[in-house]
Structure formats: structure tokens, C-alpha cells
Amino acid sequence: MNGITNRLFSCCSRFARVGAFTLWLAAMFGSCQAYSRELVMATTFSPSATAWIIQRWQTEPGSVMIRTLNRTSGSLEQLLDTANAENVDLILTSSPMLLQHLQEHQKLALLDSAPAASQKLVPRSIRSTSVAVAVSGFGLLINRSALAARHLPPPADWQDMGLPSYQGALLMSSPSRSDTNHLMVESLLQEKGWTAGWATLLAISGNLVTISSRSFGVADKIKSGLGGAGPVINNYAKLLLNDPNLAFTYFPYSAVSPTYVAVLKNSRHADEARAFIHYLLSPKGQRILADANTGKYPVAPLSADNPRAAQQQRLMAQPPLNYRLILKRQQLVQRMFDTAISFRLAQLKDAWRALHSAETRLKRPLPEIRALLTSVPVDAASSEDETWLAQFDNKSFAEQKMMEWQIWFLNNQRLAIHKLEELK
């Protein structure tokens, strides 16, 4: 009897193991099926900036899960230049420079049938592979309490940020670390002109607490009170405005910054990726992008009774940025900013502090010394000379220029300090 019982238990145990294994296989198969339909979207935006859109998409019948890879533009370039590229299907970014790079390296699929309202916002050179689904604008994120503690009014524009009263109160990123910041810097250079634009940036540099590694890092640091104000794109600011200490104000001449979407040529889920883009461009998708939770504006015009319609119209009415020029002088602007500001920030702050102190003591401006601290070693004509700009693709040429600029800035700063000492 015991033998029969043991054999029965043994048989049941084997059936149980087989059943459990079958259930495990079924679960794994189901999981793999779900994973195989997952879209991987690489993006330069922060997770909070994409969460609302993805949540709403995933309530749609037949929608697939979206997993995001949130990285800098430079990091995504490196990732997507590799063979497997982590099986990325989509790119969501405000960086035309990233999309231009990917297109030149044959990484993007062709897209067609985009609405005219979308395509007119896309730089001509990437219109065959990219569509604009939303727009943003540039402005200043303000920490009211941080400024109030220093008895300072909020700055209204780039010019205000260079005032001596804002010493140690400002934050920004750099063009080499953030394409969003690059576009903001270019909007200033194109608005004011090359020479005046750099003079403004160099005056601001004396007031910076630090250079943030990410554009949304500027917003996070201002929220924490590390700085009182800084230039950001509106969608990062809008997501923080439930904090009563924070406010956002657009620059008077804020350029429009589109949000682009593109499909990777080697996407394993190209149909699903295109379905997501069609959803974003559909009336329903545009209504979701009009929601303040995204911090963006749709490309389709908002109705006149929408409280956000007036600002959308103001953004759309601004002259478009010269994207051809931005792409041609990308290396120049990035290297100039780092050489002029990022790599010598501590010395710059000392020099500007000395100048402001001297002007206060003497009760008069010192334009000659100020000119030494606000000049750059490249003239406006060269900044638009495509033949000369193309040489920056040669690493040796670019590094040689940076060495020359370092010496130029150092000599100017030494001369400025010498002249200030003579005034004592």
C-alpha cells in the first residue's frame, strides 16, 4: 500500500512540476509578447515632461506601452550611432541638431503626410524625417522668495540679468551640455546680433552661481533656492508652477521652439511608432498637448476662448530662428561659450565683481574696461562664413582655435584687472 501511495504522490508531483512549468512558459510567452510590442522612445526631455502625454496615449484602445530613455542630446548621439541602439523606435526632442546628425548618418525613416501647420515649423533640412507636434517658448524661471531675501525684483529679460545687483543670483546651462540652452543662446545672438549678444552673455556670466549640466537642471536648482532666476524652456517651468514661490515669464522676443518626433529607420515597431505620431497630430492628441500638464502648446491653433491661445499666438508670430545658421555654427557657438564662460567662470566672476565695485566707488561707468570683458575673438562676419565655419568639423582646427581664444581672453582679463588696479 505504501508503495502504491508513494508512486501516486511521485506521479502527482511530476504533473505538478509539468503544470507549473507550463504556466511559467505561458507567463513568459505573454510577457515576451507584451515586451515585443513595447515602443522605446529616446528623448532629451525629463521624465516629468513626457509622463502626461504617455499616460493619455496608453488609455487609447490598441495602444502599446512606451518606455523612455531620457538622455542628453550628446548621449543620444553616441547611443544611436551604435549598431543595436537599445532597439530605439522613436525620438522625441526639441533639438534639430540631434535630428540633423541622425539624418546625416542615415538613422531616421522617411515620414510623409504631416500637416502643413506642423511642417512649416520644421527646419527645411530635416522635413523629410521629422514632424513638429508641439511648441514651447523661452523665458525666465523666477524663485520669488530667493530674490526677495536679497531685496531684488525679478529680471525681465537677458539685459536685466547682466545688472550688478544679480551677482551670485543666476543659473544657466551651456550650449555644449544642452541643445535647449544652445537654442536659447542662439535666439539671443540672432535677436541682438553676434557682438551685442556675446556682450550680454559675458555680462551675465559674472552673476552666475554655476553652469548646470542639464537645461532642466536649471529649473530644479532654482526650485531648490540655489539661484533666484535663470533661462529655461517653458515646459520645464510650467511643471513646477504649483510651487507658489516660483513664477515664469517669457522673454519679450521668445523664439518658438518646436517639439519634434522622428522614427528610427531600424525600428522593429515602425507601424506602432507612426500610430503614436498620428495620435499626437490628431485633434485628440493636439487637445492633450494643449493641456497645461504638458507645459507645451499644440501646433494646431487654439480656440479664441482658450486661456492659453494668446500666448500661443504670440509665440507663433515671432520670427523663426535661422536654423541653417544654427546648424552651420553649432561647433563655434559651443566652443566659444565654453572657452569664454564655462572654463573660466570663477575668474570671470572675480573680474566682474572688481569692475562693479570700481564703478560703484567712482560713481561712473567704465566702458573701456567693460569692453575688455565683453568682447569675443571672432567677428560677426566670420560667425556667418560657412566656409570658415566648416573647418570646425576638423578637430585639430577647432582645438587650435580654442587655445588661441584662451590666450586672447586671458590677456584681455589681465589688462582689465591692470586698468582697475590703476584706478585705486
What label would you give each PLM region?
Residues 351-424:
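C-terminal non-catalytic accessory extensions
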Residues 118-122, 136, 170-173, 200-205, 242-269, 279-300:
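Periplasmic-binding protein-like
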Residues 69-79, 206-220, 256:
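Short helix-initiation/N-cap motifs at beta->coil->alpha
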Residues 35-101:
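Early extracytoplasmic/lumenal segment of secretory-pathway proteins
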Residues 141-146, 256-272, 288-289:
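A bilobed periplasmic-binding-protein/Venus flytrap-type ligand-binding module shared by bacterial periplasmic
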Residues 96-101, 223, 227-245:
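A ligand-binding cleft/hinge motif common to bilobed small-molecule-binding domains
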Residues 51, 87, 95-99, 103-212, ...:
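Extracytoplasmic ligand-binding site segments that recognize negatively charged/polar headgroups
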